[in-house]
Structure formats: structure tokens, C-alpha cells
Amino acid sequence: MKYELVAGFETHIELATKTKIFCGCTTQFGGEPNTHCCPVCIGLPGTLPKLNRQVVRYGIMAGLATHGEIAEISKMDRKNYCYPDLSKAYQISQLYAPLTIGGYVELSSGKKIRLHHIHIEEDAGKLIHQHGDTYVDYNRGGVPLIEIVSEPDIRSIDEAREYVEKLQQVMRYIGISDCKMQEVSMRCDVNISVRPVGSEKLGTRTEIKNMNSINNICKAMEYEFERQVDLIESGGQVVQETLRYDDATNTTSSMRSKEDAHDYRYFRDPDLVTIHVTRKEVEEIKATLPDLPTEKCKRYVDELSIPEKDAQLLTKYRNISEYFDKACEGVKSAKTVSNFIIGQIFSRVETEADKEVFDVSVSPEQLNELVKLLDSGKIRNNLAKATLEKMLDSGKGALEFISESDMGGLDENAMLELCKQAVESNAKAVEDYKNGKEKAIKALVGFVMKNSRGKADAAAAEAKIKELIG
């Protein structure tokens, strides 16, 4: 019997506010243990929380960016459970009236992964295990989160990977989080079950907790899918439980039985007022959102004639797309700008982290100036490429490296003379070309380009050389 994977995600994203959700403590990552906390975020008796309005704003932005409906009224609830990293013995979260309802994340295939809701909540502290002892660091306690809860629409590991990558990309684009999984500012709980292909009935699910690596998410899902299938086919039953993933052994193991909502005894938090969001506020926030990557990619393809693969590279990070947009202002061909960025500038930006920041020595205005010189016919493509390399090395503008004599192409007589010299000076290349080696012509064209300092038109030079060889 063939089985299919059924998965849904609960994705926790740390919001990029300066202070925590219910107090004025800093949210800065790191710091000595228990130095970024106060009586409110460690839950001392008599303290009262005060909701950070920026958290609500960021939650609304996330909802709009994922096509959700913003609730006019939402409320904070207490999720009750005892654990050392939860100082109050409850977490302030949302269950009954979350901030955003519905929405979806669209994959490259066109499939839409539906979202159940997005809610805001506080993070817990962190347990540190050392030499057989366990310590608690409350610096992270009270850091604001959104939790994005998907429907069980994911049917493959590839869909899971793309779903997480798309969420990460969108949240970075709108500027509400850096989504650095290695710093746990984005982490996922994966709910997974299996069922026979063609069946509509959901199987018993397990939950793999606190995954903060996309590669580990994929490996854990693959292992858990195979484990559940093997268990069912051997006559066993899948137990609803919470699992941890061990990347060293590539296995999952049980942490505890899986709780349902009623196990947490949710009730309305009496210390926090109802959140009211007006339609006017939603529209004002919507107006501040940047173009999102999917829409921007489509625009590059449809309006600027950028190949889809290149458009995806240009829109992967917001800083790159904004650089590209500025460099394209007033140019004849956006494709030329794209070629320079992808072909040359990217070679100086080695890591994905560097591409996300995209702090390069050539400003978009400087690249724009270079492309306009090329557009006007004052310089040729080879000279433009060579000039860009010098610009990247120095941070200087194009005109620092291009003299008046470099501008404008070769006249016909000068081109003919250089082509004759190329043929006369490169007998072996001429002979190779005559013997059917097409690539040999490149050496002859290279001679012309070098001796013209890039002013010659390469295509015209190649045609003239072929004419001379006969």
C-alpha cells in the first residue's frame, strides 16, 4: 500500500521590536543570563503587563502579507502549564480570538498552503544544561512572537521546505523579523501524519518540536514519515505524542504525550484589555507594506523581460531587489542591469548572509551611470564589464576609469585595420578556424577587443574577421 505524507506547521517568529511584548526590557539577542529581564517578564506577584502596540502592528503586517483577514477585535489568553522556563506557570498567548484569521502561502507550483490563523504571544525562557545541572535564563522570556499556524496542506518534503523558505522570505521583506533560525528567531513545530493514498481521513499525528534548521526539518519529516509507515505496516498504531529530533542520529524520540488545547486550560487574561483594530488602521498599515517577492518577481518577468530564474535571484532578498530597482531608473534595458548584478556583483558577495545585507562597494546610482553610458553607445559592453570590475575594487564611479577617448566606437577604417592585424598576427588561430574549430575565432576577436581597449563591437569584429579569412 502506498502512503502519503500530511503535514502542517506551527511557525514561531520573533518580532524585531526593541522591547518585549509586556514590559520595557530589551529584546537584544545574547547578553549575560538574566540581565534582560524585570519583575514583569519573570512574573513576580503584583506586576501587571502592558501590551506593546508595535507587536500588534507587526502581527497585522504579517497577516496582510499572507492574505489573511485582520480581526477587528482580538484578545489575549493564558495558556497554563508548568515548566521551569515559564516563570508565571502560564504563557500569555491567543486562542479564542487571534489577531489574524485565514490566509495562505503560495508555492512556486501555484499551490496555496492555507493558514488557519496568526496570533501574538510571549516567548518562554531558556534552559541551559551544564555538568548535570539545569539553569534557567529568562532573557528570552517575554520576547514577542507571532505564531503562524497552517492547515495540514503539505504533502511532500519539497513543499515543506518551500513553505518555510517562503514564510522566511516574506517576513524579512516586510521587516518584522530577521528570521535567523540559527538564533532561534524563527523555529517550527511540525505536525505530521500518514494515510493511504486516496484516503480523505487524517491519520494520528505526531508533533516534532522546536526545529530551527530547514535541512533538519526536512530530514526529521522524512524519518518520521518512514517511521510511521513502518509502524502501521507492522500492525502497530501511531501514538499522538510530542517528539524531539536528534540530528546526530537522524532520529525522533518521544518527549511527552501530545496535548490538546483543553489540556492547557486556556482562559481570558484578566490583566490585558481587548485589542481593537479599525479598518482605517489596517489600510494605513497596508499602505506601508513593500512589494512582496512573488508579485515583484512576476513584474520583473512581465514588464522588464527578465528571465524568471534571474528574477527569482533578484527578489530573493529585499535589499537586492531595491538595489536593482534604483539601478534600473531611466535605463533602456533592465536586463543589462540584471546581467551586471548577477554576473559580476554577485561574484563579490559570497554567502547568503552577505546577499541578504548586500552591502557592495558600487552604489546603485553608480551602476545606473555605467549602464546609461552603455545605453548611449558611448562605451561597448566589454569596456563596461572591465570598468565595473575596477569600480567594485575601488568603490569609484565609472567616469574615473573611462576617458573621453574611450567613448564612442571605432570607425570603420580603424576596425578593418585591427581585424587585418588579428588575422596576420595569429596564423595558428586562422588555420584552426579554417579546419573547422569554431572557437578559434574567439582568439582573433579577443585580439581586436584588447587592442581597441574594448571600443570595438565584438559581433562586428567577428563578422569582419570571417570575411577576411574567407
Question: Predicted segment positions?
Answer:
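Small-residue helix-packing motif on alpha-helices
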Residues: 160, 311, 337, 384, ...
